[in-house]
Amino acid sequence: MTEKLQPLRGIKDLLPDDYKVHDYIISKARDVGVLYGYKQMSTPILEYTKVFNRSMGESSDVISKEIYSFLDKSNESVALRPEFTAGIIRSFISNGLQHKLPLKLFSTGPVFRYDRPQAGRQRQFHQLNYEYIGAKGAITDAETLKLAIDILKALAIEQDTLLELNSLGCSESRSAYKQKLVEYLSDFKDQLSEESKIRMIKNPMRILDSKSEIDQKIVAYAPILSEYYTDESKEYFDELIKYLDILGVKYSINPRLVRGLDYYCHTAFEFTTNKLGSQSTILAGGRYDGLSRIMGNNDDVPAIGFAAGIERIALMREYDISEVKPVFVLPIGDNNITYALEIVDKLRAQNIATIVEPLGKIAKRMQRVLNENAKFIIFIGDEEQENNSIKLKDLEKQEEYIVDFAKAFELLKKY
């Protein structure tokens, strides 16, 4: 017996009903982005692995455990994108867009991470992504957070989320903090998880984000990053808070919040929910002023951005999405098909969605139409063809009309 082929584990088909929801979410998010001046762009799904290694850091979970990376036929190491930001900054540099700053860019599409599949976490998933490149100062951070809030409002889930906010400070602040954090953690190094023992050497701040219960108990009493802010870092965060208060943005300061990637500085944020169990983060991002230089640009370029998981948004609520109900055209006999196709072409030319059902017994074709919840059927028989007319049936009102094309179009365009 021939093997029944299945999709890869953790990678799902997007069937029409799923795609309808995804398309709705993307459309709503795109519309809000346009109001803020964002323009859509796309980067390749496949990049050189070094694009992500360099930007995300060798010690990150994504690079060390989750990236889909392999050698192609030219023996080049390539990878499926695990996130958008690195590819967008690579594109910004390789296309010489420095003279077009500032740039507000929106992207959407699939990303890939070799993770343990569960509800709200798949190996292929889809993201909304926003990057504000050339964005300097706390005011742009506040605007970016307001954009995120307005997107969640447009999707009717903002009321079910909490904005958690922190500042990672400048490089000087983080350097001083890492030193104190390592000193504190050294007293517990034998108790830390194996993963955190490695992180303690490569990037100790990542231990704050550990999922290990033992690690969490240890870091609960660790030094707080804000205690090591420089005057500049403190002023920056205070200014951001001032703008958020002016805008009426509700937030919770989480001093343990760090981002999972190496390129973040200053503002870091997550919108979380209690409706999705352990997969609580709906949208997350932060500022990354140093990434462009890491990626090969001559100078640092200030930037801030965020991404939101479409699958997780879709799990937050059921969306009542209205659909265009097509008109179905049923030729009664084979000799009526040509005339039926002419009618179909005329209706489509008037932007009326139309489906022709030419094959099979009338009863079976009618059943297919009813299964689609159609509102109108057009029957084309010998009489209609001879008189250059149309028999139009309104399935909701159970009324029939025998009319010419102009009258049929007049009736249909009302719906």
Curated annotation (Swiss-Prot):
Q: Name one GO cellular component term.
A: cytoplasm
So what does this thing catalyse?
Answer: tRNA(His) + L-histidine + ATP = L-histidyl-tRNA(His) + AMP + diphosphate + H(+)
Molecular function (Gene Ontology), one example: histidine-tRNA ligase activity
Q: What is its EC number?
A: 6.1.1.21
Q: Where in the cell is it found?
A: Cytoplasm
Cite the InterPro entries for this sequence.
aa-tRNA-synth_II, aa-tRNA-synth_II/BPL/LPL, Anticodon-bd, Anticodon-bd_dom_sf, His-tRNA-ligase, HisRS-like_core, HisRS/HisZ, HisRS_anticodon
Query: What are its GO biological-process terms?
Result: histidyl-tRNA aminoacylation
PROSITE patterns found in the cross-reference section: AA_TRNA_LIGASE_II
Name the UniProt key words of this record, in alphabetical order. Answer: Aminoacyl-tRNA synthetase, ATP-binding, Cytoplasm, Ligase, Nucleotide-binding, Protein biosynthesis
Domain of life where this protein originates: Bacteria
User: What's a Pfam family this protein contains?
Assistant: HGTP_anticodon
Its quaternary structure?
Homodimer.
Give the record's family classification.
Belongs to the class-II aminoacyl-tRNA synthetase family.
Please identify the protein, giving its name as recorded: Histidine--tRNA ligase
The gene is hisS
